[in-house]
Amino acid sequence: MKAAEIREKFLKFFESKGHTIVRSSSLVPGNDPTLLFTNSGMVQFKDVFLGAETRPYSRATTAQRSVRAGGKHNDLENVGYTARHHTFFEMLGNFSFGDYFKRDAIHYAWELLTSVYKLPADKLWVTVYHDDDEAYDIWAKEVGVPAERIIRIGDNKGARYASDNFWQMGDTGPCGPCSEIFYDHGPDVWGGPPGSPEEDGDRYIEIWNLVFMQFNRDAQGNMTRLPKPCVDTGMGLERIAAVLQHVHSNYEIDLFQQLIKASARETGVADLANNSLKVIADHIRACSFLIVDGVIPGNEGRGYVLRRIVRRAIRHGYKLGRKAPFFHKLVADLVAEMGAAYPELKEAEPRVTDVLRQEEERFFETIEHGMSILEAALAELDAAGGKTLDGELAFKLHDTYGFPLDLTADVCRERGVTVDEPAFDDAMARQREQARAAGKFKATQGLEYTGAKTTFHGYEEIAFDDAKVVALYVEGASVGEVKAGESAVVVLDHTPFYAESGGQVGDQGVLANAATRFAVGDTLKVQADVIGHHGELEQGTLKVGDVVRAEIDAARRARTARNHSATHLMHKALRDVLGSHVQQKGSLVDADKTRFDFAHNAPLTDDEIRRVEAIVNEQVLANAPGIVRVMPYDDAVKGGAMALFGEKYGDEVRVLDLGFSRELCGGTHVHRTGDIGLFKIVAEGGVAAGIRRVEAITGDNAVRYVQALDARVNAAAAALKAQPSELLQRIGQVQDQVKSLEKELGALKSKLASSQGDELAQQAVEVGGVHVLAATLDGADAKTLRETVDKLKDKLKSAAIVLAAVDGGKVSLIAGVTADASKKVKAGELVNFVAQQVGGKGGGRPDMAQAGGTEPAKLPAALAGVKGWVEARL
């Protein structure tokens, strides 16, 4: 049974049991900022289990794409060397949200394994938590598993509930016992049943884990039963496929074998059991799906983990003799294997291929030099009998040649060498300390606030008359009052001030009453629904309990709103022009501009920029109203609203319809698209691999920009004595004139050089039968110097010549030696002799060479020494 069929049978089986098939969520968790990657099926349902989210179904089943590389779950160093470690894997799961519990979960699992997958019942063993009698009885009395194949697993980690068979989400929250199902490969394979001293062997392989969430643990460790217990199960597709295909290694299943063959094709390796091929086959899956989900290779966070995986794959290809980009060519093979199950992979194939190709090309620029340094260091270490690589060298490889530490460690491990990681960490810490730039620290986290939420009125109002001061902070500490001249954070019960969020800067303005005036320079969130006004008290004394009028800088807010609304229109226009792969990666919206970072692999062409501008300005001219609606998140997404990648949304979301754009957004916006006035892109560039940045301006800023541009065009036209409409034609004429004059100048220089050459020939001194000449040719360029040297060589027949010219404090040198003399006098050595004395260097052929220098004052003495230098070599 092939992996694709196993996946389909799993989902269809649970669908027949009343489960809703839910698509795999992104590898980048949208609901858990503490998690680097989605690493199990339950991640997308975490808020459902916690009661913070509801779904329209109580039973679900998924085939969840998962990654374990980096952070707590890091299998990277083992991948390719063991039978079951992967960076990317698929987790098959079924879930109950307060619906069925242990009995149905156990019976469903047994039915699928024995009746659908046709596994022999006598090959299956199960474990239960040691005091979970309910699960034990279901397995023994209802399913009929013999007692000798049901194993109770206790608290084997030194603390209550610290067991492989007791699952917990964290120190507090939902938790409960679990029951694992194992497959027995038989006595021909070494290993013992779970719980035995030999359990790490390969005979008994865990294939399915059934988690029964039935308790809630509080901060004191007390357990209370959940009113609606839940079920979370997980079965690795690769593991069950290995069992059903009668192989012992996941890399032997059909899915991996096709990728291993493709890796062998691209690297030219015949041995399909080679571990490096397994590494490459595994890594193309992780890399491709991470890019599908918007991760781009970079130097931090998820992007850095992706870069590590890509470069590890490249290094293994390099180890196999592949010294050119190859990894990206495997994307097509992956699409052939998994594109049907995951259409998003097939849709993104060109982009994934391009991102990987660019990353490969970037790494291949340095890998050879870095590998040679590492190989030399390992050879020296081996000769000295050492077993630890210097951490400083590992850091140099990381910092200069782009070798992630684990890639260096990977190479070392193959030689039985370890890396001095503490020394590496010290070097990294020193660099970070040196590179740390001073900047404004926006500290709102850590302020101890336990009062009521702030009521925000800024969507409708620019001022609020009776705002009460409910908290004050000076230098992070809560205070009762603030005096004139002090900087502080003010929390109000009501405010029109928008707090920085979603890329939009916070409002500025004033908090005032008859006796006090507090200038707000920035507005930030103290907590999710608590707004802090940062600024300075300009007069009076401000106390907790005071009532003030809170008024924003309305003109600044209006400019910011124009830019924010333009960002929405630009985002949609970029997707229309460049493709649906465009995803927002960051933004900054303030009163002056909008800065928008997005996923795209190539610079925008002038035509693409013009098309984006035209589309946005069409929307501006349409003067469409901005319509805001608050609705459930699922309804918003089903209605076509764009949810920004990586953002976390609540159950209720704010949807903004603006012209042809529909996005989830909590920012402030124009009432109609016409309020934007004018949209103009002023800059476009790259900020990281696969990430482009566009800056644009709107309204009066855009008008001033166009006016300034128009003024420069008019000034340029006037300087060239042309009308603005004729400017390009006139520039072309001037360029033609310049080329003609340069040609005339070249001819004159050549003629001058010819005449000077005749004069210079007379200055040559004969040394050992060779005419030696070292002279300065005033006003000559490099071409003229070369032509003059050639003519002098023809005229003098046997000669060693150095000619120099000085221009703008720089020295140009040309040396020429005739063929008969070049066996003893090399032009490259001769020109270097002079160049080194004038602060430069150079080189070339034995008969002709050139150099430069930066110290013209030393030129006469350097030329004077040429005769003696040549004489010494003849």
Swiss-Prot record:
Binds 1 zinc ion per subunit. InterPro entries: aa-tRNA-synth_II/BPL/LPL, Ala-tRNA-lgiase_IIc, Ala-tRNA-ligase_IIc_anticod-bd, Ala-tRNA-synth_IIc_core, Ala-tRNA-synth_IIc_N, Ala-tRNA_ligase, Ala_tRNA_ligase_euk/bac, DHHA1_dom. Keywords: Aminoacyl-tRNA synthetase, ATP-binding, Cytoplasm, Ligase, Metal-binding, Nucleotide-binding, Protein biosynthesis, RNA-binding, tRNA-binding, Zinc. The keyword Iron does not apply. It is an enzyme of class 6 (ligase). GO terms for molecular function: alanine-tRNA ligase activity; aminoacyl-tRNA deacylase activity; ATP binding; tRNA binding; zinc ion binding. Belongs to the class-II aminoacyl-tRNA synthetase family. Consists of three domains; the N-terminal catalytic domain, the editing domain and the C-terminal C-Ala domain. The editing domain removes incorrectly charged amino acids, while the C-Ala domain, along with tRNA(Ala), serves as a bridge to cooperatively bring together the editing and aminoacylation centers thus stimulating deacylation of misacylated tRNAs. This is Alanine--tRNA ligase. It comes from Burkholderia pseudomallei (strain K96243). The lineage of its organism: Bacteria, Pseudomonadati, Pseudomonadota, Betaproteobacteria, Burkholderiales.
